[in-house]
Regions:
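Bacterial N-terminal signal peptides that target proteins for export
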Residues: 2-14
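Primary recognition of N-terminal secretory signal peptides and signal-anchoring hydrophobic helices
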Residues: 4-7, 23-172
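Hydrophobic core
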Residues: 15-23
Length: 172
């Protein structure tokens, strides 16, 4: 009877251990293109919250690149966050995000954007990333939030960003 309890505890520990480290390896397996070369991301992954609710996951992490936190726009801004409207042109190389009367047009691998019609320089260009088999378009979180009028706060100690605002429902 005692052996059965020990085996059960060991099995539970092993399952928790495997699950914990398998999710860490997914976060660590992020790659993206930089200057025409494939780069493996080795930095920390960042959590993204919208109105106190986490809107990203281990398979859709926020990344620190060139001093900017880059987030997967579709998952964190469109599907689960503030419900930003979007459109893609030119095979996804031009991305337009709209929210509450504001608009930002981003260009893949370009360090400029049009914010409400005005061309602005941005420090880190949007880029395509892969986490496992999942393809993501990463955008600079602070630039996008500020352009769209979404409150943005960064907490370095918690490796998290917090967005606050009113979710907009669309009749699609």
């Amino acid at each position: 009877m005692k052996n059965v309890k020990v085996i059960k505890k060991a099995a539970i520990f092993l399952m928790v251990f495997v699950l914990a480290f398998s999710s860490l390896s997914v976060a660590a397996a992020v790659t993206y293109s930089r200057g025409g070369k494939r780069v493996r991301y080795t930095g920390s992954s960042y959590k993204v919250y919208y109105n106190s609710k986490r809107v990203n996951s281990v398979t859709r992490p926020g990344l620190m690149v060139n001093g900017n936190i880059m987030i997967p726009y579709s998952y964190t801004m469109v599907k689960r966050g503030p419900k930003v409207s979007y459109s893609k042109r030119n095979k996804g190389k031009v991305l337009t995000l709209s929210y509450n009367g504001n608009k930002i047009v981003l260009y893949l691998n370009k360090t400029y954007a049009y914010i409400n019609g005005k061309k602005e320089k941005i420090r880190t260009a949007p880029f395509k990333a892969k986490v496992g088999r999942t393809g993501l378009i990463m955008v600079p979180a602070k630039v996008v939030c500020e352009a769209l009028g979404i409150n943005y706060t960064y907490n370095a100690a918690r490796k998290a960003i917090y967005m606050t605002g009113k979710a907009i429902t669309t009749n699609a």
